[in-house]
């Protein structure tokens, strides 16, 4: 971690801070003996904030069924944790919107924030957890480090975010270029604002929940991580990987199949359309889950066709394999339909192929997508074709696959396998 850059961000005079009202509400609601009357009296001193809370409690997102006209009624109906969430969310949202730069796509940032917040609420409801408001706020604010880094670095950070094809690619690019990620900055800000640990931990570790050891914080972080991937399904320009990851993570966390995940994502899209106006966030009214999944499947079908063409155009050559063991994820290409991503154990790699072990068999000729990182942290997406699937002496499935082609990243044509330097670039990426 680059401590100098972190200190530079921490000491930035234009970095947004929590207003006095929000700080006091946070302090009051963390006390075991606080009085709702004190919170109501405090909020009444900020008419704009009170108005937003009343508008929210009367919205279809909360669906109370009757009109609430006073802050006291809203507090009783919503509860202290929900009010805390709204006060902090509205306060920071308002402050952060005041500082705008031309280098950073803040509209996409806020769209992702409200999609993730909605998803976290729905996930908590399915898990019957009482930490719904905590997860909602953590998901809403988990990427706040991006805004802080943009405030300090300006055009430099805008160029970094532009290199990420998906939000999931961003931490590797940030770490490689800056020595610091937006998640680490979010953790620093959460600590500086004296957020409870239940908020701090998910905000800091939402890209690496496996690093959290304690069970409850780990569970909350996994919820926020899944919520973020659900948001990427709607926000990423190419949602294929986000969709595959969301399905895999939903199966692991919620024990739901693809149909159950599809229902969750459809509801995320519908409910976010209700939440977004409350935070003054504009979302495309034509963006719905049915459209997203159709586009993702069309992209996968296109990839399969490109792979078939490339297979006939290049001569396969053997390349030296290097032993390399690590857990990775692949995306099977099955009939042009996006499925969940699958974790496999990478065993060896070369410029022309990979070997791995898996729990489920693959047929000869089956294709899959594997994404690795270049030296600068940006992704390289590769299409492979299975050439063998055998059981070893221990009964473990050992699978070998040959590289078919490098896939287009959507910004420039993909290099051909027979082009000069391509094999070397692939070797560096997969062996990194």
Regions found by a protein language model. Give the residues of each.
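Short beta-strand-centered aromatic/proline hotspots
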Residues: 344, 382-389
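Short conserved beta-strand and strand-loop elements enriched in small hydrophobics
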Residues: 326-335, 365-380
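Extended Gly/Ser/Thr-rich low-complexity repeat segments
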Residues: 365-375, 411-424
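N-terminal helix initiation/capping motif
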Residues: 1-2, 14-18, 273-349, 402-406, ...
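Divalent metal-dependent phosphate-bond-processing catalytic cores, especially two-metal-ion Mg2+/Mn2+ enzymes
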Residues: 189-201, 220-314
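Short, solvent-exposed secondary-structure boundary/capping segments
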Residues: 355-358, 390-404
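Conserved alpha-helical "signature site"
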Residues: 1-241
């Amino acid at each position: 971690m680059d401590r100098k850059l972190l200190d530079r961000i921490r000491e930035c005079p234009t970095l947004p801070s929590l207003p006095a009202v929000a700080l006091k509400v946070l302090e009051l609601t963390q006390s075991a003996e606080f009085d709702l009357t004190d919170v109501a009296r405090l909020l009444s001193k900020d008419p704009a904030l009170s108005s937003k809370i009343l508008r929210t409690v009367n919205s279809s997102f909360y669906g109370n069924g009757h009109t609430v006209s006073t802050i006291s009624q809203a507090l009783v109906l919503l509860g202290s944790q929900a009010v805390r969430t709204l006060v902090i969310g509205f306060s920071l949202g308002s402050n952060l919107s005041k500082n705008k730069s031309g280098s950073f796509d803040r509209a996409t940032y806020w769209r992702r924030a409200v999609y993730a917040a909605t998803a976290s609420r729905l996930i908590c409801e399915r898990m019957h957890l009482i930490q719904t408001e905590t997860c909602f706020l953590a998901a809403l604010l988990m990427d706040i480090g991006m805004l802080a880094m943009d405030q300090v670095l300006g055009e430099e950070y805008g160029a970094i975010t532009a290199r990420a094809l998906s939000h999931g690619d961003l931490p590797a690019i940030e770490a490689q270029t800056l020595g610091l990620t937006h998640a680490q900055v979010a953790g620093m800000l959460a600590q500086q604002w004296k957020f409870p640990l239940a908020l701090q931990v998910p905000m800091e570790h939402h890209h690496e929940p496996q690093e959290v050891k304690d069970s409850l914080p780990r569970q909350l972080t996994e919820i926020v991580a899944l919520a973020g991937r659900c948001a990427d399904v709607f926000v990423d320009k190419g949602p294929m990987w986000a969709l595959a990851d969301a399905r895999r993570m939903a199966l692991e966390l919620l024990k739901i199949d693809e149909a159950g995940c599809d229902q969750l994502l459809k509801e995320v899209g519908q409910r976010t359309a209700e939440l977004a106006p409350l935070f003054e966030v504009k979302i495309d009214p034509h963006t719905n889950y049915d459209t997203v999944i159709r586009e993702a499947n069309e992209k996968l079908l296109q990839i399969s066709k490109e792979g078939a063409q490339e297979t006939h155009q290049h001569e396969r050559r053997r390349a030296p394999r290097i032993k390399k063991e690590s857990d990775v994820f692949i995306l099977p290409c099955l009939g042009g339909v996006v499925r969940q991503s699958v974790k496999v154990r990478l065993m060896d790699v070369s410029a022309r192929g990979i070997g791995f072990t898996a729990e489920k068999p693959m047929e000869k000729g089956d294709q899959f997508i594997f994404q690795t990182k270049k030296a600068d942290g940006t992704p390289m997406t590769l299409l492979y074709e299975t050439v063998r699937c055998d059981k070893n002496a221990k009964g473990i499935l050992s699978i070998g696959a040959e590289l078919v082609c490098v896939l287009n990243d959507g910004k420039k044509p993909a290099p051909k396998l027979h082009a000069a330097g391509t094999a070397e670039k692939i070797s560096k990426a997969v062996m990194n």
